[in-house]
Design a protein with these regions (language model features):
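Glycine-rich phosphate/diphosphate-binding loop of Rossmann-like nucleotide-binding domains
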Residues: 1-16
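Buried hydrophobic positions in well-ordered alpha/beta secondary-structure cores of metabolic enzymes
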Residues: 7-8, 30, 118
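NAD(P)-dependent dehydrogenase/reductase Rossmann-like domain
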Residues: 77-130
Length: 130
């Protein structure tokens, strides 16, 4: 994990599967597609020391996914910090910030959004290489 740029989780775990170590998570793109019920959790609290946003597909993710509902209940995350992927796709403002820091994408099953975000990031990457 130390030398990874991207970390993906896809488990039905009830407890975080990543270490609660902000230095291991710093500067990574974290994509969590498991923990689809309020009782499940893949991502540790250390993520909230590194980023103040989470990118989601639909607002109900804040209630449905334990990775979000638990930190909201504990006061670590506010619903306003959850940014819709559709808003991300419409805006160029966050791209440089996303590339420079720790980012957290939480997916709860809308693959179409995942594909659109991946397509936009790939296009931006190709643009920068030219």
């Amino acid at each position: 994990m130390k030398h990874s740029d991207i970390i993906c989780t896809a488990t039905p775990s009830a407890v975080p599967v990543l270490p609660n170590d902000k230095e291991l998570l710093r500067g990574k793109c974290i994509i969590a597609i498991g923990s689809y019920t309020p009782e499940m959790r893949e991502i540790p609290d250390a993520i909230w020391d590194l980023t103040d946003k989470v990118y989601i597909e639909l607002p109900y993710a804040c209630e449905e996914a334990g990775d979000l509902s638990q930190p909201i209940a504990e006061g670590r995350l506010k619903k306003e910090q959850a940014v819709l992927m559709s808003d991300f796709l419409k805006s160029d403002a966050d791209e440089d910030q996303i590339a420079a820091g720790t980012t957290y994408f939480k997916s709860v099953g809308m693959a179409l959004f995942d594909i659109c975000v991946a397509q936009k990031l790939l296009a931006k990457s190709k643009e920068k290489q030219q």
